[in-house]
Amino acid sequence: MISLIIAVYKNIKALELILQSINKQSFRNFEVLIAEDGQDEAMRLLIEQSHGRYNFSIKHYSHVDIGFRKIIIGNEAIRNAQGEYVIFIDGDCILHPRFVEEYYKAMKPGSFFFGRRVMLGPKLSKTLYDRPVLNTPSFLQLLLSDSKQVREGLYLPLLQSKEKVNREIWGCNWGVSKQHLLEVNGFDEDYTLPCFGEDLDIDWRLVKLGLKRYSLKNKVIQYHLYHPLIWDENIESRGRKLYEQKRDDGFAQCLNGIEKLSIKVQYDD
């Protein structure tokens, strides 16, 4: 079974579209875990209503909104995941109908996998939001729209996955076995700021563990719903500094993760 973890924060309309896209998946042996970095009542009601609307398992994990704690609730979802493999997506990315299937066919022990996403433009995003039923954008529709990185939306199922030595994951679209997540102790909860760090951190720790990284470009396709970019150079700088310190330490297993540890385990290169 696959555990699909969705990181969400307040965007209820986007989650509704994501759940519709999940309901269109060709591969059905999965569960959905919604990791909410907050406790929005409207979000809770949508998820509660979704239990009777969809024929897949939906679990909801949340905590009080006191700032950026996405990593903490993400670890809670990992802890409770029942699948042998875990896929991570963000709460503003709808999925191609064969998204989960392509991950399922590719994933294996000793490796982790990632994809990219189409950046939907404001007009096409509004069109999707305004429709009561999701119609997944076709490649032609993407070409004729105001979207960017459209080439990422071309589905090429016969394309071979490629090992990527110098290409890191994006936190919005990647997957790995739960066992490997436990071996590195999940996400490092020392990352308490947005913009930079937590996904790159777990990426290098999985490589340090000995895993190989593979691209599933043009196979595990996402469509990112438009919203204004929120970025802070100062916050990014602080996250980058912490990330560099962690890499200099060189430990695959973080202390402040799923478990709270006092002794680090170092793995040989």
Feature map (PLM): residue ranges:
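Short, flexible, basic/aromatic active-site loop/helix in glycosyltransferases
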Residues: 133-166
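Short aromatic/hydrophobic "clamp" motif used to bind/position activated sugar donors
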Residues: 86
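Glycine-rich, basic loop-to-helix element that forms the pyrophosphate-binding segment
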Residues: 64-81
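A conserved acidic beta->alpha catalytic loop
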Residues: 36-46, 93
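C-terminal catalytic/acceptor-binding lobe
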Residues: 190-269
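Conserved donor NDP-sugar-binding/catalytic core segment of glycosyltransferases
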Residues: 98-139
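Short, acidic, metal-binding catalytic loop of nucleotide-sugar glycosyltransferases
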Residues: 20-29
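Short beta-strand/loop segment that forms part of the nucleotide-sugar
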Residues: 29-39, 59-63
